[in-house]
Amino acid sequence: MSRLGFEQFPDYQVPGMKHPDFSPYESNGGSIVAIAGDDFAVIAADTRLSSGYNIHSRTQSKLFKLSPQTVLGSAGCWADTLSLTGSIKVRMQSYEHTHLRTMTTEAVAQMLSIAMYNRRFFPYYVSNILAGIDNEGKGVVYSYDPIGHCEKATYRAGGTAGTLLQPVLDNQIGHKNMNLEDADKIKLTKERAVSVASDTFISAAERDIYTGDSVLINIITKDGIEVRTLTLRQD
């Protein structure tokens, strides 16, 4: 700027340090589907761990067994996923040592909500879905927003392909906007839930580059957790 015939703030064109914008988050992709039945719960997640167009791993599980009847699916920023799940496991171990019993699925759901809310000013960049068996032996699914608000549901999808997966669940599990009599609705069995979860991931892998390679499916019952694997496209 010129004033009184001379430059007030001359630009000497001196090269200096440049500070690019700092981004504390990284999206590593991944998708999750969970379905609750009368006496079971099914939760599935793909195994692709990526960043942009780079694939870091094709075999990384995003399902974390917290107890014999509770499984957490977590996708998003992998560093935040490891930090959150590690913290939850430590708290569960402390509870078990203090009370000499394993936390129920409902208690884990509440604890996870509190842990996420404690980080509300710098939230975990993850999409969490918790599935398990409740005190009455019924399947339950809990979904969360970034600051820990918890919602109990019959089925839920999350992650990078969540918007592609959820409408399929609404149609096949929830029978939304379908003129069906109760007698015409297909009964939700374990195999039906596994089939729908598998089909949703096969479809999502065609449209979402952050979802693929394979799917790990956990079938949770009062007797334990059964694990199945489904291969997806790997491109």
UniProtKB/Swiss-Prot annotation:
SUPFAM superfamilies: N-terminal nucleophile aminohydrolases (Ntn hydrolases)
UniProt key word Cytoplasm: yes
Protein name in the entry: Proteasome subunit beta type-1
Assembly: The 26S proteasome consists of a 20S proteasome core and two 19S regulatory subunits. The 20S proteasome core is composed of 28 subunits that are arranged in four stacked rings, resulting in a barrel-shaped structure. The two end rings are each formed by seven alpha subunits, and the two central rings are each formed by seven beta subunits. The catalytic chamber with the active sites is on the inside of the barrel.
Purpose of the protein: Non-catalytic component of the proteasome, a multicatalytic proteinase complex which is characterized by its ability to cleave peptides with Arg, Phe, Tyr, Leu, and Glu adjacent to the leaving group at neutral or slightly basic pH. The proteasome has an ATP-dependent proteolytic activity.
Positions of the propeptide removed during maturation: 1-20
A biological-process GO annotation: proteasome-mediated ubiquitin-dependent protein catabolic process
Localization (cell): Cytoplasm; Nucleus
Keyword Cytoplasm belongs to the record: yes
GO CC annotations on file: cytosol; nucleoplasm; nucleus; proteasome complex; proteasome core complex; proteasome core complex, beta-subunit complex
Similarity annotation: Belongs to the peptidase T1B family.
Regions that span the bilayer: none
Organism classification: Eukaryota, Metazoa, Ecdysozoa, Arthropoda, Hexapoda
PANTHER family noted in UniProt: METALLOPROTEASE TLDD, PROTEASOME SUBUNIT BETA TYPE-1
A Pfam family assignment: Proteasome
